[in-house]
Design a protein with these regions (language model features):
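Glycoside hydrolase catalytic-domain context in secreted enzymes
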Residues: 1-507
Length: 507
C-alpha cells in the first residue's frame, strides 16, 4: 500500500489512491485479520449495537491496513430462499435490516455525519434491492410490484439517514418494473435506476460505485462515478469517448471524498499500528461473542451435558474451515491459515481428543449401536460460496449423503445433534426428523466461529438466537412463495423469529 501511495505522491498531481475491498465480513482478503460472522449470522442476534461494534472493528483493521473503502454493508432482503447471496443479508425482515444496515454504516464511517479522517467509506449495496431475483437465480431480472419495490427501497432510504459515502447498484440484474433503460440495462448501467430513483427520488448526492463486469462507458454516461473492475485500457478508452464535463463531475465527487478522508495529508500505513490493531485478541473475543449470540436452537429434546461423553463428529464440513464463512475472503487454497480452526478441532480442544471420534462422510463407519453416553455431532449444510450456492438454486434440500448419515445414526439409537451451517433457508424436514437437537449456526466466521460452536455445544454460553427467515418444510412451499415478498411461506417448518432459548445446552 505504501509503495503505491509513494508513486502517487511523486506523480504530477500527487493524488493519493483510495483502496477498496469487497469486505462484507471484515478485512477478509488479507491474512491474520479478524474475519467476522456473515451478515445473516448477525441477523439472528437481533442486536444492532453489536453490528455497529463489529463494523467498528472492521474500520479499525481496514484503516490500519490502508484500505479506506469497504464494499459493504448489503442492504438486500432475503425474500427468496433460493438466492445464493442471502448469507450477505440480515434476513427477510425490513425493520431488522434497516437497523443493522444503519449500524454497519455508522461503525464503518465512525459516526452518522458522513466520512472523516477516521472513517472507512461505506458502499451500501445492491441498489435498489437485489434480493428478489427471478426464480432465485442470481443475475436474473428483479421482481417487484409497487408495494414490494417500496419495501426493498426502504432499506436504502434508512441507510441514507447516516450518509454512506457510496451506493452500488446491482451489476447483474435488470429492473423491468422501473421501465425505460432499466428494462434492458443492468442496474449499474441504467439512468432510470441511478438518476431517476437514486438521485431523483431519494435525493442521494454521494458516490455511485458500479459492480463488476460492465460496459464502463455506458455506466458513466448513465450516472456512475466509480467503475468496478476497470483496468488501464478501459480508462484510456473512456477518456477518449466520454464528455469531459462528465469526467469533471465524477472527479469532483471522488476528490471531495479523498479530502474528507484526510488521505492527501497522510496516505501511509504504520507497521506498529497494524501489529497492534489487526487480528487482536479483543477483536477475536467480540467476533466469538457475535457467533455465540447467533446460535439458534430449533429442536431440543432430552439433552444432557456433553462433558464426559464420548463424541462422534460426523460430516466433512466438520473439518472444512472455509465453510465457516462465505466465499468473500482469502481461502485455504489461497493462503488462509486454517490450523486449529475447524469445528472438529474446537470440539477436540473442548472435550479432549481422546473422547472424540471423527467419522467424516463414510456411513459404513457408523456402528449399529453405541454405548449410553455417546452423542453424534453431525455438521451439515453447504460449502462456502459467493454468487452461486453449492447445491445450485433448483433445490434447498440436503444432499442424499448428508441425509443418509443422519438416518443411519438415528437408527443406531445414538443421541444426534445436528449442527447446521446455513447460508440459505434450507428444507429442514429430514434433519428435524433424524435429530434429537438441531442447532443452526449460519456462517459463524473463520476466525472465532468454530470455538463459538463448541462453546454452545458444551454449555459454555447461553443460546438465544432467533431465525432471521422462515424455514420451509418442503420445496413445494418454496416454489409457491413470491420472490419479492417476505414471510409468505404458509405453514413453514419453523417460522421467522423462532428459536428455543436455553441458559446452557444440556441443562
Amino acid at each position: 500500500m505504501n509503495y503505491v501511495q509513494s508513486l502517487c505522491e511523486e506523480s504530477e498531481l500527487g493524488i493519493p489512491v483510495v483502496f477498496s475491498m469487497d469486505s462484507v465480513i471484515g478485512a477478509s482478503w488479507i491474512n491474520d485479520t479478524t474475519i467476522l460472522p456473515d451478515a445473516i449470522t448477525l441477523g439472528a442476534t437481533g442486536d444492532a449495537e453489536l453490528v455497529q461494534e463489529l463494523a467498528d472493528i472492521q474500520r479499525q483493521e481496514m484503516k490500519a491496513l490502508g484500505v479506506r473503502m469497504s464494499l459493504s454493508p448489503n442492504a438486500d432482503l432475503a425474500t427468496d430462499p433460493r438466492w445464493g447471496r442471502n448469507q450477505e443479508t440480515y434476513g427477510e425482515d425490513a425493520d431488522t435490516a434497516k437497523a443493522m444496515v444503519v449500524a454497519a454504516i455508522t461503525g464503518l464511517q465512525n459516526g452518522t455525519d458522513g466520512i472523516g479522517v477516521d472513517s472507512v467509506m461505506s458502499c451500501v449495496k445492491h441498489f435498489p434491492g437485489s434480493g428478489p431475483q427471478t426464480g432465485g437465480v442470481d443475475g436474473s431480472p428483479l421482481v417487484f410490484d409497487d408495494e414490494t419495490f417500496a419495501l426493498h427501497l426502504s432499506i436504502f432510504e434508512a441507510a441514507l439517514t447516516v450518509h454512506p459515502a457510496s451506493i452500488m447498484p446491482y451489476g447483474y440484474s435488470t429492473v423491468p418494473y422501473l421501465g425505460g433503460d432499466a428494462v434492458e440495462n443492468y442496474a449499474h448501467e441504467s439512468s432510470v435506476v441511478m438518476n431517476d430513483v437514486l438521485r431523483g427520488r431519494l435525493g442521494y448526492d454521494g458516490i455511485i460505485q458500479t459492480d463488476w463486469g460492465l460496459n464502463h462507458i455506458v455506466a458513466m454516461q448513465a450516472g456512475a462515478d466509480v467503475m468496478g473492475g476497470m483496468g488501464q485500457r478501459d480508462v484510456t478508452r473512456m477518456v477518449d469517448q466520454v464528455d469531459p464535463s462528465l469526467l469533471t463531475d465524477r472527479c469532483r465527487r471522488l476528490l471531495l471524498a479523498k479530502f474528507r478522508l484526510g488521505v492527501f495529508e497522510n496516505p501511509y500505513t504504520d507497521a506498529d499500528e497494524i501489529a497492534q490493531v489487526v487480528g487482536s485478541e479483543e477483536h477475536y473475543q467480540k467476533a466469538m461473542e457475535a457467533a455465540e449470540k447467533a446460535v439458534t436452537l430449533v429442536k431440543y429434546e432430552n439433552q444432557q451435558p456433553l462433558e464426559g461423553q464420548q463424541i462422534l463428529v460426523v460430516g466433512a464440513l466438520a473439518k472444512n474451515v472455509d465453510a465457516l464463512s462465505s466465499g468473500w475472503k482469502i481461502s485455504s487454497e489461497t493462503g488462509l491459515k486454517t490450523e486449529g480452526k475447524s469445528i472438529y478441532d474446537a470440539i477436540c480442544k473442548r472435550a479432549g481428543a481422546d473422547n472424540v471420534t471423527y467419522i467424516g462422510e463414510d456411513e459404513t463407519l457408523i456402528a449399529d449401536s453405541y454405548p449410553a453416553g455417546t452423542t453424534a455431532i453431525v455438521v451439515v449444510g453447504e460449502a462456502s460460496g459467493t454468487h452461486e450456492p453449492a447445491w445450485g438454486t433448483a433445490t434447498l434440500e440436503f444432499p442424499a449423503e448428508q441425509q443418509n448419515l443422519l438416518k443411519k445414526l438415528d437408527a443406531s439409537g445414538v443421541n444426534v445433534v445436528a449442527v447446521v451451517l446455513m447460508n440459505r433457508a434450507y428444507v429442514m424436514t429430514p434433519v428435524d426428523a433424524a435429530s434429537d437437537a438441531v442447532m443452526i449456526v449460519y456462517r459463524p466466521g473463520v476466525t472465532a466461529g468454530a470455538e463459538a460452536v463448541a462453546h454452545a455445544l458444551f454449555g459454555d454460553c447461553a443460546i438465544s438466537g432467533k431465525l432471521p427467515w422462515q424455514i420451509p418444510a418442503t420445496m413445494d412451499q418454496v416454489m409457491l412463495q413470491r420472490e419479492d415478498l417476505p414471510k409468505d411461506i404458509e405453514n413453514p417448518l419453523y417460522d421467522y423469529g423462532f428459536g428455543i432459548e436455553v441458559a446452557a445446552f444440556g441443562q
